[in-house]
Amino acid sequence: MRLSLVGVAIGLLSSSAIVTAQTYTDCNPLQKTCPPDPALGRSVTYDFTKGSSPDFKPVGSPTYDSNNGAAFSVAKQGDAPLIQSNWYMMFGHVEFVIKTAPGKGIVSSAVLQSDDLDEIDWEWLGANNLYVQTNYFGKGDTGSYNRGAAHDNAGNQDGFHTYTIDWTSTQIVWQIDGKTVRVLTAESAGDHFPQSPMMVKVGVWAGGDPNNAPGTIQWAGGETDYSAGPYTMYLKSLVATDYSTGKSYTYSDKSGSWRSITSDGGQINGNSDAESISTVESAPPVTATIDSAPIPFSGTHRETSSFVTPSIWPWVPKPTTLSSSVAKDTTLPSGWTFSGSRQVQPPSAASSTPPCTSSSLVSSLASPSHSGLKTSSISSVPNSSSATKSTGHLASTATYQISTYDSTLPSFSASIAHVAPTVAAANDLLEAPLGMGVFCALLGGLIAIF
């Protein structure tokens, strides 16, 4: 029975184990001088119903048939077939005609990836026939996980759809059957914007393999039952247009910037007239975004030094630099002083009401619903980079979006530690100002008597 994904708001990409279908690089030009990348430099169409192409290197054992094209099957433990292009494009347009693989724990993917681990992705979970995930990475940086998104894509396992990536120096556009589902601008992505020569990879792997980390297995929808396979993804055709020209692309320095890339016998952006998607003024809303939690490895990142696979799901994020409990005010009330013996001395006039710190924290956690997607907000103390500091008081709160999907998997409540107190803790916070006021009044009275 096909199961919907619980908590698809976990985006994509990364980890440190498992199958050969993951991303790696033979030579990282950010670390050393590497050979030039062979350029596509033109527009090409591949019809895989006619068989394989010498322009693609097979890994594993993809097969071909006249109806569906290239077939990538997981039939037993360790299977992770894919094809990868022998050429690179320096900005460009790719259209994949794909029918994704069903099956709990099975992951289908179509990826653009560079030698320095820039990456643009489509990924489908076999446990979910309703959604597709998109993601991007710059220089293999998996230090934050606010880049993934999920989009409506009902029936992706039942028939072929056209999935497009249009990539320029200013934006990335993801489309399904000609309809734009996401736009990323270079300005908004900053240093994480993919901007170096990319190869194409298409394939399938078992995220639910029992040897994988528990977190990876649960993200993939559960443990893969190989006896119920094989699980097959199909790539009927692929159209690719390189927006640059030449024979090869070379990194002239170790910056990874697109302006540092040179073309042998051509020009970067020399084929920009072939751009098929003009600037998109506004992007449609995505089905779900991932702002706050790390995500499990999804079959396209293997060797990234900054990531360690979590062993459980849901993950617990590290505490922020500010405490999520009530801030402590260590200063004395206005007019109060310490005597030479370090005794508290009230002002000579009427008693002063001490400032009592309070903070209202509200937690509304997302949970699965048979009515579909539910999104909840969690008020949390932000990290120091997003807070306005003030003595003894919390300045603001940050809102994280957690999305869940209708599922027949065992229900759970998404949880984030160091975000919001329990009900009892919240009551304690509300009672704190009253208790502090009573304490200060008693203290002032005792000092006045003695």
Swiss-Prot record:
Gene3D superfamilies hit by this protein: 2.60.120.200
Signal peptide range in chain numbering: 1-21
Keywords for this protein: Cell membrane, Cell wall, Cell wall biogenesis/degradation, Disulfide bond, Glycoprotein, Glycosidase, Glycosyltransferase, GPI-anchor, Hydrolase, Lipoprotein, Membrane, Secreted, Signal, Transferase
Assigned EC number: 3.2.1.14, 2.4.-.-
Gene Ontology CC terms: fungal-type cell wall; incipient cellular bud site; plasma membrane; side of membrane
Annotated compartments: Cell membrane; Secreted, Cell wall
Molecular functions per Gene Ontology: glycosyltransferase activity; hydrolase activity, hydrolyzing O-glycosyl compounds
Keyword Cell wall biogenesis/degradation on entry: yes
Membrane-crossing residue ranges in chain numbering: none
Domain of life, source organism: Eukaryota
GO biological process terms on file: carbohydrate metabolic process; chitin metabolic process; fungal-type cell wall organization
Residues modified by glycosylation: 383
Modification comment: The GPI-like anchor contains a phosphoceramide lipid group. The anchor position has not been determined.
SUPFAM superfamilies linked: Concanavalin A-like lectins/glucanases
Similarity comment: family membership: Belongs to the glycosyl hydrolase 16 family. CRH1 subfamily.
Name used for this protein in its record: Crh-like protein 4
Highest classification ranks of the organism: Eukaryota, Fungi, Dikarya, Ascomycota, Pezizomycotina
Gene for this chain: crh4
